[in-house]
Structure formats: structure tokens, C-alpha cells
């Protein structure tokens, strides 16, 4: 492996990386040996409410130093199964959305060309679009999307097409996602109108609102998700505002009435068997995370995703 017990010593003092893993950049001689790369995208130019997700990767890195090497339920030891490394951050251009997206896509094209599966920490949810432009290189893929919002609006504020509320509308239009293999879970909160839901229905996206989420057994619900997604390539996108703000207050657009922190982990554990080619965890906003609980939950969700990806 490219690491040597880095993730087993929670008190090791070093430059912060995700889960104390080695930092392996694209010019590193062992870049091509990496199986799963953890990547930060410190960019929130798509934010329309409370800013701050650009600081998410650094805060989640710090929180992740207390993530240990073994899964508490499955016993999975991901760092012994695959070569996993922190690939560093993508350098965005905070003054130019399109240049930033191009930079992100180019970075991920390099990652994908090396055969590395990316696990991303944002950043706001617009981050997912340029990542998908690189990940869905062979054609449209499926997606499991945990969020309190659909992020399917056509535009915000006088026609702005690229915000954290529009990435998956663009992804469907650009043929990056197969809408009939997209499931959105946890949708709730007040709405401007029904445009996003109408679009979802018109293209075949399955929306599981929070009312249905709480009425059904999670294992049963996630079995339906696995049936919809099938065994083809899929992406997992996790907005931390999927979780109730009691447990995850540090986010830009919180919505009350959401899942608790255990349910936040449980839904990822139920992704077993999916062909996951990439994943992201976005919208952690440290300025609103006074206790650090949101960042630690985000780091824990990352570890759950990682355990699914090593067995994918």
C-alpha cells in the first residue's frame, strides 16, 4: 500500500490530510497506484444563501483526523483493501464560475485517466457538475442524491444558470446523468414553485420526500433505490443539509425536519452492492459550525462512502 498505518494512529502529528492519509499529487511517482482519491474543492461561488462551504475541505480534513481505520458494523478496513490517498485541493478561480468549473473538470479528468475513483469534499453543490463532466466520460450514469433540495431548477435570480440549485438540471441536459436511474432522497422545505419537481417527473427522476422517508423502513426504502440504480455505474452526491440542522447546523441552506445523524450514516450503509464510480459530500459551512459537529459528521459520512467504494 502507499500508506503505512497512517490511518491507525489518531494522534500522529502531521500536516492535516483526509483521515491522515498520504498526500499524493498528480506529479507524485505513485499517483498511478492510487485506487481512491480524496479531493477537496474549496469553492462556493454557486452559493445563494449563507456562504462558507469553500472552507469545508479544510474543516473536514481536521475533523477526519479522528476517523479510525475499521468500520464499526461491517469490520471493513478500507485502507488495507485499496490504495487510498489525499490528492489535495483543486484550485478554483473565485472570480469566474466557468473558469473554475473548467479547472475542476480538468483536474478530475487527470484523476479518472489514472484509474482513480474520486471522493470529493466541497464546496457548494455546484461542485458536482464539473466533477460529473469528468466522471461520466463514457455516457450518462446513475446517481443517488441525498439532499433537502432537488437542485433541479433551470435558473436562479433573473436567469442565472449555474448555482448550487441547478447542477443536476444541467447534468441531465448535458447527458451526464440518466434521469431514470437518478433517485433523490430527503427532499423537503418550502419552495419557490414546483418547476424542479415538474422537471423531475417529466424525465423520470424518482423523488423520495422526507414524509415517505420517515414512513418507510430505511432498509426497504434503500432496496428500492438499489433496484432503480441497478448494477451500472452510479455516482453518490451527499449534501449535508439532508441531515436535520439539529445535528448538522453548519450549512448554507438548512431545512428543519430532517434525518438524525444515525440515519445519515445508515442510508450510506444501505448502498452496498452499487457500482459507485465517484462520490461527493458538499455544503459543510464552517462559519456556521460552532461546535464542529457538522464537519465531524461530514467526515464520518465520507468514511461510510469510502467503505462502500472499496467494495464496489
Predicted regions and their residues:
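Active-site rim beta-loop-alpha module in soluble metabolic enzymes
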Residues: 172-248
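Short glycine-enriched, charge-decorated loop/helix-capping segments at active-site entrances
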Residues: 157-161, 249-257
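Single conserved hydrophobic/aromatic residue that forms the stacking wall/gate
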Residues: 1-7, 11
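N-terminal catalytic or cofactor-binding beta/alpha core of small enzyme domains
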Residues: 23-120, 125, 188
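Short, electropositive alpha-helical surface patch
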Residues: 94-104, 196-208, 289-311
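Active-site flanking residues adjacent to catalytic metal/cofactor-binding acidic residues
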Residues: 39, 123, 146, 185, ...
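Gly/Ser/Thr-rich active-site loops/lids in small-molecule metabolic enzymes
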Residues: 145, 255-269
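Active-site histidine-anchored catalytic micro-motif
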Residues: 103, 108-109, 113-181
Amino acid at each position: 500500500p502507499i500508506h503505512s498505518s497512517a490511518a491507525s494512529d489518531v494522534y500522529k502529528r502531521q500536516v492535516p490530510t483526509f483521515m491522515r492519509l498520504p498526500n499524493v499529487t498528480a506529479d507524485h511517482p505513485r499517483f498511478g497506484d492510487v485506487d481512491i482519491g480524496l479531493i477537496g474543492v474549496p469553492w462556493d461561488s454557486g452559493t445563494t444563501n449563507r456562504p462558507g462551504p469553500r472552507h469545508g475541505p479544510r474543516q473536514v480534513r481536521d475533523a477526519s483526523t479522528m476517523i479510525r481505520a475499521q468500520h464499526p458494523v461491517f469490520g471493513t478496513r478500507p485502507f488495507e483493501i485499496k490504495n487510498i490517498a489525499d490528492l489535495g485541493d483543486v484550485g478554483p478561480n473565485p472570480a469566474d464560475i466557468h473558469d473554475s468549473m473548467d479547472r475542476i473538470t480538468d483536474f478530475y479528468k487527470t484523476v479518472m485517466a489514472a484509474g482513480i475513483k474520486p471522493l470529493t469534499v466541497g464546496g457548494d453543490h455546484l461542485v458536482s457538475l464539473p466533477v460529473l463532466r469528468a466522471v461520466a466520460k463514457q455516457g450518462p450514469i446513475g446517481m443517488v442524491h441525498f439532499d433537502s433540495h432537488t437542485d433541479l431548477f433551470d435558473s436562479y435570480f433573473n436567469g442565472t444558470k449555474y448555482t448550487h440549485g441547478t447542477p443536476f438540471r444541467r447534468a441531465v441536459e448535458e447527458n451526464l446523468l440518466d434521469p431514470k436511474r437518478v433517485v433523490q432522497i430527503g427532499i423537503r422545505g418550502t419552495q419557490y414553485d414546483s418547476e424542479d419537481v415538474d422537471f423531475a417527473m417529466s424525465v423520470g427522476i424518482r423523488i423520495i420526500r422526507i414524509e415517505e422517508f420517515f414512513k418507510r423502513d430505511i432498509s426497504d426504502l434503500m432496496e428500492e433505490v438499489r433496484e432503480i440504480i441497478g448494477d451500472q455505474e452510479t455516482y453518490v452526491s451527499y449534501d449535508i443539509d439532508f441531515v436535520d440542522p439539529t445535528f448538522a447546523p453548519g450549512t448554507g441552506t438548512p431545512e428543519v425536519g430532517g434525518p438524525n445523524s444515525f440515519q445519515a450514516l445508515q442510508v450510506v450503509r444501505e448502498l452496498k452492492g452499487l457500482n459507485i464510480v465517484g462520490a461527493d459530500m458538499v455544503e459543510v459551512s464552517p462559519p456556521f459550525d460552532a461546535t464542529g459537529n457538522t464537519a465531524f459528521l461530514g467526515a464520518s459520512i465520507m468514511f461510510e462512502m469510502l467503505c462502500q467504494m472499496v467494495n464496489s
